[in-house]
Amino acid sequence: VGPGWMNKMGRWEQPYELLYKSYSDGCAYYGKLKKEGQLIDMTMSEFADYYREKKGVNDNNYNEPECALWRDILYGSDKQLFWYCDPYMRACVNMDQGGAIVDLRPYAAKLEWPVGIGTKHVQDASYPFLIQEKYRAGYFTHYAGEGTVRSAKLSYKGEEVDLCLCPTHAHFSQEGKTRILTLDPVTIEFRDLTVKLQTKEYFEEGSSNIKIERNILEMSDPTAEVTLNEYMVACYGTTEYSEDMSNITLKIDGPEEKEIHYAYKCREEGVVGAKEVSAVIPEIETRVSMTASDETAEGYVKEGYAFSPMFTLGYRKTISDKEVFAT
């Protein structure tokens, strides 16, 4: 909220008098607290200095994350988002899309990103993303191909369901230095099979790791097997358009090594038993990788093309009732 709320040009739903009173009352309340010594007002630079001191940044021991499990109360949608931010990354998990990661920024690179007249970024002060749902469309993409998102798909007898289509809610907890997001189970219905699945997401302090665990709680046919495809579609940039990805290298480490040097040719490689799949993005000094809890899973990498330029890292695994698979 700022003084712009008090303009008289009819931009807001409320009348000017109400907006003026609301803003004035707010300022008066903060002023009263300041006079009583209960509040200190700071510029953003002053607050940054205060934050660094309080969090231990100045003593080189800053690992503690900021965590916020947010629920929409303004519009009554009952949607939930979870924000996680530490010196290594910022991530956003969207429970309305089944616990998909819809924003991911690799702070570990600590990029020098000068902004202003005379620099490469005259106005754009955003830190580059690997995943950004709003700019790169997420699951509900507006062009051919997939938008950036970290999610999973379940397949059975030719049918496929993405967990992005399974809204749910989550509960936050902490064990030691690991923050845990436990999602309510979702039910996936195929033509002749029903699967009840629960997701847990683990954020380990100071590690730059996110572990996503899928637990098959129940199947209508206990003998059935479904294919789980854990995937991450990503690119890099700060706007709706990804930057030039020609220098990106996609790699599979395992019994057999595979590499794709990005050329927008829509190529794909896969290796059963892959130890790791990864992408190196030199322009933002970032390496992002995925590993699997089961050595029999197939790791794969996919290259994009001009009109759907994002790369994909993923693991495919056949799973059955009561099985747990983590990446």
Predicted features by range, described:
Residues 1-49, 295-325:
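Catalytic grooves of carbohydrate-active enzymes
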Residues 1-2, 116-119, 182-187, 211, ...:
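Beta-strand-rich recognition/accessory modules
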Residues 36-39, 80, 187:
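C-terminal regulatory/interaction regions
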Residues 52-93:
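Surface beta-strand/loop "capping" patches
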Residues 72-75, 82, 164-176, 201-203, ...:
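Short, exposed beta-strand/loop patches in secreted or surface proteins that constitute
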Residues 79-83, 169, 178, 247, ...:
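Short, acidic/polar N-cap/turn motifs at the starts of alpha helices
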Residues 90-189:
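Acidic-aromatic substrate-binding/catalytic surfaces of carbohydrate-active enzymes
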Residues 103-107, 186-197, 205-254:
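Acidic (Asp/Glu-rich), glycine- and aromatic
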